[in-house]
From Swiss-Prot:
<dbReference type="Pfam" id="PF00491">
    <property type="entry name" value="Arginase"/>
</dbReference>
<feature type="binding site">
    <location>
        <position position="130"/>
    </location>
    <ligand>
        <name>Mn(2+) 1</name>
    </ligand>
</feature>
<keyword id="KW-0369">Histidine metabolism</keyword>
<dbReference type="GO" id="GO:0033389">
    <property type="term" value="P:putrescine biosynthetic process from arginine, via agmatine"/>
</dbReference>
<dbReference type="InterPro" id="IPR023696">
    <property type="entry name" value="Ureohydrolase_dom_sf"/>
</dbReference>
<comment type="function">
    <text>Catalyzes the conversion of N-formimidoyl-L-glutamate to L-glutamate and formamide.</text>
</comment>
<keyword id="KW-0479">Metal-binding</keyword>
<feature type="binding site">
    <location>
        <position position="155"/>
    </location>
    <ligand>
        <name>Mn(2+) 2</name>
    </ligand>
</feature>
<keyword id="KW-0378">Hydrolase</keyword>
<keyword id="KW-0464">Manganese</keyword>
<feature type="binding site">
    <location>
        <position position="243"/>
    </location>
    <ligand>
        <name>Mn(2+) 2</name>
    </ligand>
</feature>
<dbReference type="GO" id="GO:0050415">
    <property type="term" value="F:formimidoylglutamase activity"/>
</dbReference>
<dbReference type="GO" id="GO:0008783">
    <property type="term" value="F:agmatinase activity"/>
</dbReference>
<comment type="pathway">
    <text>Amino-acid degradation; L-histidine degradation into L-glutamate; L-glutamate from N-formimidoyl-L-glutamate (hydrolase route): step 1/1.</text>
</comment>
<comment type="similarity">
    <text>Belongs to the arginase family.</text>
</comment>
<feature type="binding site">
    <location>
        <position position="155"/>
    </location>
    <ligand>
        <name>Mn(2+) 1</name>
    </ligand>
</feature>
<feature type="binding site">
    <location>
        <position position="159"/>
    </location>
    <ligand>
        <name>Mn(2+) 1</name>
    </ligand>
</feature>
Length: 313
């Protein structure tokens, strides 16, 4: 059974510059850490949650280790300067999945996300493998059953695989099937896709599903496509698979990208999403601290989370 645990206070430590000025604060001083999972107490805040699971990566024949990412990313976030928006972050702990019950873990995350959103919070989830996306996305769909939900994925992979059980490569096929079951449209856009990393069958599935696909080669000029996608939906779920970044910026993932989309381009793409007023949920997935020798990759991932919270409107 998937268990919930509050985040350890030892994760939220950093340099104290408060002697310099009242506003010389860092995230460890402004993030609120909750000892209970009680989203109803935190309306209008951002629920920071960890999904400590990499069973989907294992099933997908990837490099395990992403289950350790949520706490590693908290440590990287803790010492970053606190600016506008960061005071809204409330750490609602980790959902820890026992091997091999991926399906139970996804259901627990789904229920937690739906509860947060219905309580008036927004969700920022630290994965975990990209199996995080089915639980997170399903929770968003549940919470906004009467509205159109757009799923924006920055990823080298389409993750539309067809297998006999859920993996880190199946979440968007699962979400498409959930939309079919709920008789609602499946709005999915994937930016940063590597043609070299996706079979013709996956491209055919994306075409059949009317997925908006922007390749890694074209992301430098993709803002218009991002804006068009934002405009056609009511609510947005943003998911960032860190393997969208080039290996020289992000080596600490299951499948590092030979080409990838540089961090600065990723930030330019997600800024209008964050500022749109439609973003309800976001996550960072596939970070693997086992392959982060000096903590540099954790800081790259944390900068994305930092920026999302700062820009979120």
């Amino acid at each position: 059974m998937t268990q919930w645990y509050p985040a350890s206070p030892a994760l939220w430590q950093g340099r104290d510059d408060s002697i310099e000025a009242p506003d010389a604060r860092r995230l460890f001083q402004t993030v609120t850490r909750s000892e209970t999972f009680s989203p109803e107490n935190w309306q209008q805040k951002i629920a920071l949650m960890g999904f400590a699971c990499d069973e989907g990566v294992k099933r997908n024949a990837g490099r395990p280790g992403a289950a350790g990412a949520p706490d590693a990313l908290r440590k990287a976030l803790a010492n970053m300067a606190s600016h506008q928006g960061h005071e809204r972050l409330v750490d609602l702990g980790n959902w820890v999945a026992p091997t091999p019950d991926l399906e139970g873990a996804q259901q627990a995350l789904r229920d937690a996300v739906s509860r947060c959103l219905r309580a008036g919070m927004r969700t920022l989830v630290l994965g975990g493998g990209h199996e995080t996306a089915f639980g997170h996305g399903a929770g968003v769909l549940d919470a906004f059953a009467q509205e159109s939900v757009g799923i924006i994925n920055l990823d080298a992979h389409l993750d539309l695989r067809q297998t006999d059980r859920a993996t880190s490569g199946t979440p968007f096929r699962q979400l498409a099937q959930l939309c079919d079951a709920q008789s609602r449209a499946f709005h999915y856009a994937c930016f940063g896709v590597s043609r070299a990393a996706n079979t013709q069958a996956l491209w055919r599935e994306a075409q059949w599903r009317n997925v908006t696909v922007v390749e890694d080669l074209d992301c430098h000029d993709a803002l218009a496509q991002m804006t068009q996608f934002i405009d056609k939906v009511d609510k947005i779920y943003l998911t960032i698979d860190l393997d969208v970044l080039p290996v020289w910026e992000m080596p600490a993932v299951s499948a590092p990208a030979a080409l990838g989309v540089p961090l600065i381009q990723v930030l330019r793409l997600i800024e209008p999403v964050c500022r749109s007023g439609k973003l309800q949920a976001a996550d960072l997935v596939e970070f693997n601290p086992r392959f982060d020798e000096d903590g540099a990759a954790a800081r790259v991932a944390a900068r994305l989370g930092w920026q999302i919270a700062h820009w979120w409107r």
